[in-house]
């Protein structure tokens, strides 16, 4: 899935279907087996044994929490440590890697009951998604009013999954080349531009292999799920309480499939579609179509505030204003760094999070009035963040490419996305370029596991979804709900922010608290009215 910067309702405070993949366009994969989805039977048995070995070691060792690395710039109240996991679970005595973990201990005091003491319920482990997002800042969320009751009962635990940050980091290219700007972003690319992007995708895939070697094949979702079980053991938890957002819901669901008896409670916020036939090529086609709908929502909001922004009184007029800015930036980049690709990246964020709407509309309005400063500030590359961003993209690419078969014939990509771009031009081709290295991936592919639990196999789980989420289309929440027996789906109606847990919707948060604090869920499904739309911000006169 195409991933923007981490900004789920939880992560924000802290700071990706038309046709099936043709058989002729996919690489060979190892046969799956009941012993371990995505592997041969013998390897699956070895990986299950290796996970048990690693978890037993972690339980005996624990995590020695202490001061966090200075480079993380975390406050003193957060403590950090590491947990050791095998690079390859089929060989638990082979190469080991360390995952960085952060924690704030439960306060034990309920802020809504006069600081009345409350019992500790263990660790709440969070993953923000991506793949490639860092979870180290998650414990800071306990400072927010919406999270104080949860922070009273739970140790808030974040971590960097394998490949992220200091957790055996991946890299595929020189970070100094990562944030080059300005750059083009054609919505209907020429054949010459397509050939250029194919060449770049091949070079990027080669770079991943050259920089990581044989280790590259071990960065995938099944190993992320196994790592999570080792982390559970290292934290001293018999059963896991987990919240995943976006991609984090996918490997959380893999965990539930592989280790159902190790689950205490699980929250899936903004679920991706776990159907093995959709991981990940068809999921990205669905996502591009959903981005178009959410882009229309944003333009409709801007048009209703034409008196503030002057960008047009209809969505079509707002589109023309956007295209005018894009054409102008192609001819003369703003600040020497912001071209059409940087504009596109900034406005893609508006399809993830409503909070961006006033800022992006104001910046576009200001730019078209001859004042580019806000657009440069919001869309310009931040070179200080290049290394972190390059690392995030490398992990994203490795995990998605390793997880599943992808079409290996460029003609399949070209056919499907040319069709899609006729009706969904906003993000379709940029989504292609983000994922195209998977067509030329040098490492073996997994076969996606059949995420599924039967009645009574898994404790009840909570699924949260916004009805108009573009990054994780709502169909994914319905599919996740169908596959996890006993799960309950809470929908935020007529809303589209990507990730809704712990945000401004009190109805959603009440369901989240009731579940995590009391184990209480609605009988079947529940719906919450959507959050209020953002208020416009008037540009300077």
Task: Enumerate the predicted regions with their spans.
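Secretory targeting and sorting signals
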Residues: 1-35, 83, 228
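C-terminal region of N-terminal signal peptides and the immediate post-cleavage residues
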Residues: 16-61
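N-terminal low-complexity, Ser/Thr- and acidic-residue-enriched intrinsically disordered segments
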Residues: 27-28, 40-44, 137-140, 169, ...
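Gly/Pro-rich cap/lid or specificity-loop segments adjacent to the active site
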Residues: 45-342, 398-400, 404-541
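Flexible "cap/lid" loop of the alpha/beta hydrolase fold
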Residues: 272-290, 363-365, 372-386
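Structural motif
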Residues: 330-344, 352-356, 386-394
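Short helix-capping/linker segments at secondary-structure and domain boundaries
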Residues: 351-369, 406-411
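Long, low-complexity segments enriched in small/aliphatic residues
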Residues: 369-413
């Amino acid at each position: 899935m195409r991933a923007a910067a981490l900004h789920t309702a939880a992560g924000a405070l802290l700071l990706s279907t038309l046709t099936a993949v043709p058989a002729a366009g996919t690489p060979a994969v190892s046969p799956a087996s009941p012993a371990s989805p995505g592997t041969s039977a013998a390897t699956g048995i070895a990986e299950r044994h290796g996970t048990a070995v690693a978890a037993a070691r972690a339980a005996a060792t624990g995590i020695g929490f202490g001061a966090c690395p200075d480079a993380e710039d975390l406050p003193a109240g957060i403590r950090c440590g590491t947990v050791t996991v095998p690079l390859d679970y089929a060989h638990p005595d082979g190469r080991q890697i360390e995952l960085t973990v952060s924690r704030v201990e439960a306060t034990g005091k309920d802020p809504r009951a006069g600081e009345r003491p409350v019992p500790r319920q263990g660790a709440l482990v969070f993953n923000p998604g991506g793949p490639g997002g860092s979870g180290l800042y998650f414990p800071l969320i306990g400072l927010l009013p919406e999270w104080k009751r949860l922070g009273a009962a739970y140790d808030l635990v974040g971590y960097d999954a394998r490949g992220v940050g200091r957790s055996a980091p991946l890299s595929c290219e020189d970070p100094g080349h990562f944030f080059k700007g300005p750059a083009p972003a054609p919505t209907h690319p020429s054949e010459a531009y397509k050939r250029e992007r194919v060449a770049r995708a091949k070079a990027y895939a080669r770079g991943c292999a050259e920089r990581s070697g044989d280790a590259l094949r071990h960065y995938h979702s099944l190993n992320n799920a196994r790592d999570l079980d080792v982390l559970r053991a290292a934290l001293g938890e018999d059963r896991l309480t987990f919240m995943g957002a976006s991609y984090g819901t996918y490997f959380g669901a893999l965990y539930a499939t592989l280790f159902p008896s190790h689950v205490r409670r699980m929250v899936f916020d903004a679920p991706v579609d776990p159907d093995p036939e959709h991981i990940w090529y068809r999921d990205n086609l669905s996502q591009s179509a959903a981005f178009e709908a959410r882009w229309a929502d944003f333009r409709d909001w801007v048009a209703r505030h034409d008196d503030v922004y002057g960008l047009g009184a209809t969505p079509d007029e707002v589109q023309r204003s956007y295209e005018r800015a894009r054409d102008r930036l192609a001819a003369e980049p703003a600040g020497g760094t912001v071209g059409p690709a940087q504009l596109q990246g900034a406005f893609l964020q508006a399809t993830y999070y409503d909070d961006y709407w006033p800022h992006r509309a104001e910046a576009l309005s200001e730019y078209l009035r001859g004042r580019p400063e806000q657009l440069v500030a919001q869309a310009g590359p931040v070179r200080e963040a290049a290394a972190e961003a390059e690392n995030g993209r490398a992990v994203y690419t490795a995990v998605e490419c390793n997880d599943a078969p992808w079409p290996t014939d460029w003609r399949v990509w070209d056919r499907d996305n040319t069709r899609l771009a006729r009706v969904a031009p906003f993000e379709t081709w940029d989504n292609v370029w983000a994922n195209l290295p998977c067509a030329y991936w040098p490492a073996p592919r997994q076969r996606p596991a059949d995420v599924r639990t039967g009645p009574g196999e898994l404790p009840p789980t909570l699924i949260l979804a916004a009805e108009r989420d573009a990054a994780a289309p709502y169909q994914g929440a319905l599919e996740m709900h169908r596959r996890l027996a006993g799960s309950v789906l809470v929908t935020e109606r007529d809303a589209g922010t990507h990730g809704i847990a712990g945000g401004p919707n009190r109805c959603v948060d009440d369901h989240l608290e009731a579940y995590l604090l009391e184990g209480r869920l609605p009988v079947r499904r529940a719906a919450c009215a959507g959050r209020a739309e953002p208020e416009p911000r008037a540009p300077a006169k």
